[in-house]
């Protein structure tokens, strides 16, 4: 794993490709405020990692265990802490500059992790894309779930059976998205396509694992 950044989703817009003229939908992610919180080494902690803090927070709003952690590190409390496993050669030197947009470059492939929009309690057709039952000819099922295995042997509902329930509001990772542009003056990264979450939600951007 490599070092990544924490960001906040600003919204979506579009850019035009300079060569083909094609319109490219992009997501704008604000990454201003990433700071090195803690550097973990194999000798001291058993593994190499970099802990990144993002989005300053009042000390009164932080739980006591976290407040003690921030006090020990000597940094201002933040809303988010994210740890990135890295190789020993990737650990920053003491006094190194905090990570910023220059960590990524245009054309690079990344993975984006976020929390999808919550959609509340939904039926099986919307939640799992079921086809549905007949809409006419005497059918009274319409949008119902249908059989869930009660007449099978053994007659019980199996674990992980697709049924109505809470939809969305879950951690999701979108892989292999392309960085279209990096704008250091605005501290934003423009990534092709859509990413999970609503405007203002937190995202983690990391180099793509499968590229």
Swiss-Prot record:
Q: Which GO terms describe its biological process?
A: translation
- Its name, as the record gives it, is Large ribosomal subunit protein uL3
Source species of the chain: Akkermansia muciniphila (strain ATCC BAA-835 / DSM 22959 / JCM 33894 / BCRC 81048 / CCUG 64013 / CIP 107961 / Muc)
User: What gene is it encoded by?
Assistant: rplC
- NCBIfam families given in the database record: L3_bact
Instruction: Provide the taxonomic classification.
Output: Bacteria, Pseudomonadati, Verrucomicrobiota, Verrucomicrobiia, Verrucomicrobiales
Offer one Pfam family short name for this entry.
Answer: Ribosomal_L3
Listed under GO cellular component are: cytosolic large ribosomal subunit
Role description: One of the primary rRNA binding proteins, it binds directly near the 3'-end of the 23S rRNA, where it nucleates assembly of the 50S subunit.
Q: How does this protein assemble?
A: Part of the 50S ribosomal subunit. Forms a cluster with proteins L14 and L19.
């Amino acid at each position: 794993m490599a070092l990544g950044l924490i960001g906040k989703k600003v919204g979506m817009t579009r850019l035009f490709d300079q060569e083909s003229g094609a319109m490219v939908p992009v997501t704008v992610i604000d990454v201003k405020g990433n700071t090195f919180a803690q550097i973990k080494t194999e000798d001291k902690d058993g593994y190499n990692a970099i802990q990144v803090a993002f989005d300053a927070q009042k000390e009164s709003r932080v739980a006591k265990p976290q407040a003690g952690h921030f006090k020990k590190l000597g940094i201002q409390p933040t809303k988010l802490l994210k740890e990135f496993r890295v190789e020993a050669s990737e650990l920053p030197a003491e006094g190194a500059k905090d990570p910023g947009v220059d960590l990524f470059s245009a054309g690079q492939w990344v993975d984006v992790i976020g929390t999808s929009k919550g959609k509340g309690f939904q039926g099986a057709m919307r939640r799992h894309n079921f086809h549905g039952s007949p809409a006419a000819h005497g059918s009274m099922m319409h949008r119902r779930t249908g059989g869930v295995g009660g007449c099978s042997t053994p007659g019980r509902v199996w674990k992980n059976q697709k049924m109505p329930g809470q939809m969305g509001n879950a951690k999701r990772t979108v892989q292999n998205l392309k960085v279209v542009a990096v704008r250091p003056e605005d501290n934003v990264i423009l990534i092709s396509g859509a990413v999970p979450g609503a405007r203002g939600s937190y995202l983690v951007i990391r180099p793509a694992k499968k590229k």
